[in-house]
A protein has these predicted regions:
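Periplasmic/extracellular loop-to-transmembrane helix junction in inner-membrane transport proteins
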Residues: 4-13, 42-87, 234-252
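Transmembrane alpha-helix signature in integral membrane proteins
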Residues: 21, 68-103, 261
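Generic hydrophobic transmembrane alpha-helix motif, especially the helices
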Residues: 58, 62, 68, 89, ...
């Protein structure tokens, strides 16, 4: 509890980071809590196609006359969940194999680095388009795994470099001399000293996963099922909403939702870097 109060105190001294933290909480509430209190309105209403913002429809309506605000509320859960899972999978994968490569060294290090180098040479967007077009993933888990497999190489190299520097520290040498085992050395001695680095990378990986997910949905490379901010953008484009004078709200709403959530994440990550780094904190 004292640690949480200290964190909030440090965060309060960074207005941009505090705004980002509040923004993240707002969108998490919007995506996961608000749907319990706001009924889904997905029935087409042809008489209200592309309505301008009003008291009845604060963000206007779409090409089927459905309320845009209602879609924003229900469209956040899918895109945020996939982004979170993709960041989680890629972070765990990179940390595990990056730490093993640095700790074991030798042939294991060479093999892992070789695979990483090959992965880094492949254009990620092209590979993603090909994989998505072939597999046509529709579930949270499959899409998150695909995104994670494209994100891990760059982090793995960074984790390896961090572990290489930590393995020479006195407390790691002491653990090794006590024969505490590889698992203990990596997960009890090294990784706790990298937690700030891991948290910041996780946040940034989530932003990348959300943007990438939005791109492949907008391009129509995966089945358009459920409610999703990116699906709103796809239909806004495919239904020609951009050509209707009063329909810009239908396009602008999901763009702002994605952009503001991403901005909140980046602002929070920047503040966390200041808080976790004593040199930046004292600057």
């Amino acid at each position: 509890m004292a640690g949480a109060r200290e964190f909030l105190r440090l965060l309060a001294g960074r207005p941009v980071g505090l705004a980002g933290f509040i923004g993240v909480l707002f969108f998490v509430f919007l995506a996961y809590v608000a749907p319990f209190f706001v009924p889904l309105q997905d029935t087409p209403n042809i008489s209200e196609i592309y309505q301008t913002p009003s008291l009845a429809h604060p963000l206007g309506t779409d090409f089927q006359g459905r309320d845009t605000l209602n879609q924003i509320v229900y469209g956040g859960r899918d895109i945020l969940t996939v982004g979170f899972l993709a960041a989680l999978f890629s972070t765990v994968l990179a940390i595990t194999f990056g730490a093993l490569a640095a700790t074991l060294g030798g042939r294991v290090d060479s093999i892992i680095l070789g695979i990483t180098d090959v992965a880094l040479t492949i254009p990620q967007l092209i590979l993603l388009i090909v994989v998505a077009a072939i597999l046509r993933p529709s579930g949270f888990l499959i899409l998150a795994v695909i995104l994670a497999l494209l994100q891990w190489p760059s982090l793995l190299r960074q984790v390896r470099a961090q572990v290489l520097s930590l393995k020479e520290r006195d407390y790691v040498e002491a653990a090794r001399s006590l024969d505490l085992g590889l698992f203990h050395i990596i997960f009890r001695e090294m990784l706790p000293n990298m937690r700030s680095y891991i948290v910041i990378h996780f946040i940034l990986a989530m932003t990348q996963a959300i943007y990438t997910q939005a791109a492949i949905i907008f391009l129509g490379l995966i089945p358009l099922t459920g409610q999703n901010w990116a699906i709103m953008l796809y239909f806004a484009n495919s239904q020609g909403a951009i050509f209707f004078r009063d329909s810009f709200w239908y396009i602008l709403s999901p763009i702002l939702a994605i952009a503001l959530f991403q901005l909140s994440l980046v602002s929070l990550a920047s503040a966390l870097e200041d808080i976790f780094n004593p040199r930046l904190r004292s600057a």
